[in-house]
Structures are given as C-alpha cells and as structure tokens.
C-alpha cells in the first residue's frame, strides 16, 4: 500500500518532469524564433533600427507557413490583414518569404515607389524561378535586357500589331467554342482556356507551328508553373523536380524548332510569316554579335508562359463572376448585341475599333483583374540600401509588391470583396492602386494582348453560349493562382 509521502513524491517528480519539458520547449521555441533575426537582422548593424516592423519567422521556412495557411483558407487576405493588425498601417513590413529575407509593400504609395524606381529596385526572383525560366537571361545587364525587351515587346503592342491578331484570335475562339459545345459533355473549362490562349501566343511567337507541338508544350508548362514559387529542391516528389524535368523537355522541343527555323528563316521572310522567334534569331548587338541559342530559348520560355496564363484565368473568372451576377451578364450581353447592330451588313468579324467601344466589358475585365489578383507577389530586389517612407530596405533583400494587398484594401476600394464593375465609372486609379500587370520599366509587355484575347472571347461567348457548371459552389483554391478547386468543370452549351 502506497503511503501519502510516496504519492506526494511521485506527484512532485511528475511536476518536475513537466516543468523541464515546458521550460525546454519555451527556450527552444524562443531560440528558433530568433535565429532568422540574428542571422539576417543583427548583421545589419545600426541599419537594423530603421527596418520596417515585422518578424523573420522560422529558420529556413521564414513566414511561409503563415502564408500557406492563409492562402489555403477561403480568405487569403488575412495574411496582410494580420500584418496591419499587429504592426499598424505602415504599408511596408519586414518578413522572410519565398526562402529569402523580404520587404513586403502593400499600399499604392509604397508599391508605386518600388515599381517605378529601376535605379534602386531591380528584377528579383526566387531561386526556383531563376532555374526554371533561365538564370542566364534573367541575369542580363539592364541595357541588354532593355534591348531584348524591345524586341519581344514590339509584337504585342500598338494598334497595328493588335489589329493583325484580331482575326486570328477570332478564328481560334469561334472554332474552339463550337468544338466544346459539340462535345455535349462536361470538360475542364480552365484547362481548355489555357489551350486556347496557348494557341494564340504560339502563333505570335512562332509565326506558325503545328497544333500537336503546341499541345505538347502546354502540357509541360502545367508542371513548370507549379514549380516556379516552390523551394528549389531537386528530389523526386517535389514540385521543383517535376518542373525542372518539364523545362528540360521544353528546351529540347524549342531547340528543335529553333534549329529548323534557322534553316527556313529566309523562306519564311519571303512568305511574310515572321514570329518573335525570327526577330530573336536576327537580333544583333552594336558589335554585330547575335544572341546565343540559350538566351533565345529562355526568352521563348518566358514569353510563352506570360502570354497564356493571365488571359486564360482572367477569361474564366470573368465568365464565373458574370454568372454570379445575372443583371451584369445581361447588361454585358446587350452591349455586344448593340455592337453587332451598328456594324455594316457587309462586315464580317470584329474590328479593333469595335473592341474599343466595349465600355462595360472593359469595366468587367478591369474588375476581374482587380478581384482575382492572379499573380502575387511581384518580385523585385534592392540594388542598394534604400529608404521607403523612412524605413530602410537593405541591399540584396527581395522586395515583394503585394498586389492583392492593394486590390483588396478597403481604404483603396470600398467593399473590395464585392465584384462591382460600376466602381470603374469615371474612375481613374491613382498610381500604384491598380497593378495587375505590374508597373514601371518592367510592366508586363503583353498586357494589351491579354486584354484583347479576353474581349474577343467574351464577345463570342456572351452572344452565343452559356456555361453549365458541374459544381456551382466549388470552393476556390488560391495556390499557385486563384481558381475553382475543380478547375471549373462545366459544359459549354450553344444558345438557341
């Protein structure tokens, strides 16, 4: 039989063990939470006192767990809201995200400062993005990059360039909508939209190429996209491993196309079928030196990626938002019917002038881009120690322009979670408050083409088709980009 003294001794021993366990946990927890601060902040010396508010998170992981947790809920904006609640509305915070020490900017003023100042803030990307899109090309000097950017921008910009593409985009949209409706079954709408957009950008990049080749490339891009923001861990089972394999297959395909195009370039020029690839093959610097194949392939990979993801996702979301708001759907449809009524009876197909008359559809597209904020963040890197609103941004730290933080800020847009095209009535957004395509010297060169594709797709869809969703209440997944978790399984039905 146990005596009271034995029971008391055992009880005290258990308390001692528990106290040691809790104490060890607290000390270890506190130590681990301070490692990043000691490693990244303390080494800055006196500059550390003028860093923005915030915390550096866990070793290696930083604040990625908080980021992922927020973006796996139904309200990803809690990530920024939590920073504002804890540290005040400074518009700039220190953190450790995407595997690097970071400064997050999320107000129009701070975003504008970073995007417009190319002297202090240059291009910056996670290591995984550099590996997958091409370190050699992403690491070019500013002057060389400007020269190449001009080459790759010219095919996308200006009325003359866009007018050339209207008819081609129309043909693709009309044919594929008719094909989808003819299937008379549910399909993965987002996947089909990505294929549509890839056909368009493929035509612009290559001038002409086989549908089979474009379909193969589009499949590789699916894996490539999933690895862009993931940790650069090249081990089977990780997204980066699959993405790197996809890049190698893409490089091989593009090298074959490049070799073939070099042989045929003279003939193609005579036919007038010139794509971006031909401009890159012909490009020379001031010393007459041509681009190496590696550079050309990297530029093709970057432009093919940028040229189809935005338009595919935005077109899908525009349709979904309109179906959630029947009165907006009807108003948008009536505008398209009016455009048809006003055109001469001899005219076939859309013109760029008609597209410019789509005022309500323009507001729908702008609101779709704001509400979805497809790609966050925009990556920059501090080229030198810089000051923003009195806070220090250390040289070498990545600067994350949090587009969603601006687009979903109730002080910038009233009721930001509401889809409301009327907010664009007679509204000119102030600099830094509407940045779906970035801003400054590195603004997305394909922004005009992206919107052109969306206009043309919505025009024909609204007039002739409807969407029957398999899962109307499907939850939204926000990583890597916002989309219905089933990728919008739906049936495209031709209107009678």
Curated annotation (Swiss-Prot):
A Pfam family of this chain: p450
Requisite cofactors: heme
Chain sites annotated for binding heme: 444
Subcellular location: Membrane
Membrane topology category: Single-pass membrane protein
Pathway, per record: Secondary metabolite biosynthesis; terpenoid biosynthesis
SUPFAM superfamilies linked to this entry: Cytochrome P450
Positions of transmembrane segments: 11-31
CC per GO annotation: endoplasmic reticulum; membrane
GO molecular function: ent-kaurenoic acid monooxygenase activity; heme binding; iron ion binding
The reaction(s) this protein catalyses: melianol + reduced [NADPH--hemoprotein reductase] + O2 = 7,8-epoxymelianol + oxidized [NADPH--hemoprotein reductase] + H2O + H(+)
Any one biological process term the GO annotation gives: brassinosteroid homeostasis
Tree of life domain: Eukaryota
EC assignment: 1.14.14.-
Gene3D superfamilies xrefs: Cytochrome P450
Keyword annotations of the record: Heme, Iron, Membrane, Metal-binding, Monooxygenase, Oxidoreductase, Transmembrane, Transmembrane helix
UniProt xrefs under InterPro entries: Cyt_P450, Cyt_P450_E_grp-I, Cyt_P450_sf
Main location: membrane
Stated family: Belongs to the cytochrome P450 family.
PANTHER family per the UniProt record, alphabetical: CYTOCHROME P450 26, CYTOCHROME P450 88D6
Task performed by this protein: Monooxygenase involved in the biosynthesis of glabretanes, limonoids and quassinoids triterpene natural products such as ailanthone, chaparrinone, glaucarubinone and amarolide, allelopathic degraded triterpene lactones inhibiting the growth of other plants, and possessing antimalarial, antifeedant, insecticidal, anti-inflammatory and anticancer activities. Catalyzes the epoxidation of melianol to produce 7,8-epoxymelianol.
Protein name (Swiss-Prot/TrEMBL): 7,8-epoxymelianol synthase CYP88A154
Gene: CYP88A154
